[in-house]
């Protein structure tokens, strides 16, 4: 940490993007460190913070937290911690809640191991094999390519309307 601080000394970045925090402690540590070096701190949360048991289309002010999923609980706790820490400082924060994102190197799907095996899903699709689906195939999931996510993020950097706000960034694929 000392070495990084010496390298970053006297540098201020337009934005820091935090993709790595999965708990309120992670968020507190990250914000305390990086907020010294940025004008706008981005926390990449997840649409998973919403209470999906309620159904429907979720907006930024929709009810939060499906209380049975640690990922949802922890991302929401992280958001609350960020707001608490940023309040009263000069650092502007922006919370981004993406839907499921995929790209050429990662295609998340619940039955596929997280890293290195996502092409097994694609192989099943290409070979006409069955794919396991939850809730008798009635579950819906919004997905978007990482490039589309990036377009949404770029529009928020340095944008005063994005300061101290949360945004859903979702694709048009369901």
Regions found by a protein language model. Name each.
Residues 3, 15, 29, 81, ...:
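Alpha-helical elements of Rossmann-like donor-binding domains used by nucleotide-donor carbohydrate transfer enzymes
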Residues 3-11:
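Short amphipathic alpha-helix with an adjacent loop that forms part of the alpha/beta core around
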Residues 10-57, 66-69, 73-84:
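NAD(P)-cofactor binding segment of oxidoreductase domains
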Residues 17, 42, 94-96, 167:
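Hydrophobic/aromatic beta-strand patches that form the interior of the parallel beta-sheet core
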Residues 66-97, 104, 117, 126:
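Active-site Tyr-X1-5-Lys
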Residues 107-114:
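Short, flexible/disordered intra-domain loops and linkers
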